[in-house]
């Protein structure tokens, strides 16, 4: 199984509602027509998340959303890319966006909190309030799931293990957990490209940036 990530910036400040409608109601559902995609979810770096983050860098600072797809294996990547081309050709793509970081990453670690009934491999499919993500150095996933608000964690790495992405799935209060996890990952955060919480994207609730968006 591979994780395909996209850290996405919406380049038009007035375009967040349109972007969310496109992604949640058109683009994301279409991905599940591809055999070998078992999971797809997107989270938002809301203003409240930005205020709670532990680290950022020039490359990742512009992003607003993180999407994660789980692919059966690398053979799923060609049809995944081909679908993107077909949607572009059919004018079913959102132009005012750019990926500041994207691509496939190998799964190198999985953890589940002892209190949850599911296996570590099932954690992403379990409902959560959001995630806490560390991009850059590897962090010990066990230290994350030891926190009572974390159901589990998955860790991904690029092919040369130069960049790790650790995703902790938070089923407790997100920002309380984020405060505690920021202390847990403090040493790694000094070298991290980005570290912080991301909120769950709920259907038809896309107003996080409304007060920041010109009308």
Regions found by a protein language model. Name each.
Residues 1-215:
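Macromolecular interaction modules
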């Amino acid at each position: 199984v591979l994780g395909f990530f996209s850290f996405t910036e919406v380049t038009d400040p007035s375009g967040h509602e349109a972007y969310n409608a496109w992604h949640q109601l058109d683009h994301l559902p279409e991905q599940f027509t591809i055999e070998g995609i078992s999971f797809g979810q997107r989270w938002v770096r809301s203003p409240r998340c930005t205020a709670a983050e532990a680290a950022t860098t020039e490359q990742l600072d512009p992003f607003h959303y993180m999407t994660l797809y789980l692919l059966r294996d690398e053979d799923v990547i060609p049809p995944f890319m081909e679908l993107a081309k077909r949607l572009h050709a059919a004018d079913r793509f959102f132009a005012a966006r750019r990926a500041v970081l994207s691509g496939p990453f190998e799964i190198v670690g999985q953890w589940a909190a002892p209190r949850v009934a599911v296996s570590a491999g099932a954690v992403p499919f379990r409902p959560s309030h959001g995630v806490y993500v560390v991009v850059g150095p590897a962090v010990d996933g066990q230290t994350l799931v030891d926190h009572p608000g974390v159901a589990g964690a998955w860790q991904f790495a690029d092919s040369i293990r130069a960049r790790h992405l650790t995703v902790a799935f938070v089923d407790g209060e997100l920002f309380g957990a984020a405060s505690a996890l920021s202390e847990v990952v403090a040493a790694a955060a000094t070298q991290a490209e980005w570290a912080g919480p991301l909120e769950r994207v709920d259907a038809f609730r896309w107003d996080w940036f409304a007060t920041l968006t010109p009308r």
